[in-house]
UniProtKB/Swiss-Prot annotation:
It comes from Coxiella burnetii (strain RSA 493 / Nine Mile phase I). GO terms for molecular function: small ribosomal subunit rRNA binding; structural constituent of ribosome. This is Small ribosomal subunit protein bS6. InterPro entries: Ribosomal_bS6, Ribosomal_bS6_sf, Ribosomal_S6_plastid/chlpt, Transl_elong_EF1B/ribsomal_bS6. The gene is rpsF. Keywords: Ribonucleoprotein, Ribosomal protein, RNA-binding, rRNA-binding. Belongs to the bacterial ribosomal protein bS6 family.
Amino acid sequence: MRHYEIVILVHPDQSSQVPAMVERYQSMIKEKDGKVHRLEDWGRRQLAYSIDKVHKAHYLLMNIESDQGVISELENAFRYNDAVIRSLILKRDHAITKSSLIMQGAEKGKSSRKEKVAAEAEASEEA
């Protein structure tokens, strides 16, 4: 089995369907004895350029281990799903399980905001 990294851009109007789509794709992978090593939902983000007059998209990242047959099925599923506006499948040398730089940046931003709020709360209590 080979390792793959998959990035999926979903139309922003279809964001509510993302959990069902993820479940469907995971079941396709697991039916054929594949494994999902990492799944990240990056949420809605601004596109670098518009695609079909859409300026934002809902991003998903998956790292999987599977056969080529599963990849072909996933490509067909992406191609015929109107909610998917772009997809990219890359072959990787090994399984990637740690969080991506985008998620690390988001977590860092959340922690720094929490620290800032806590510091402001302490300052207001002292005053």
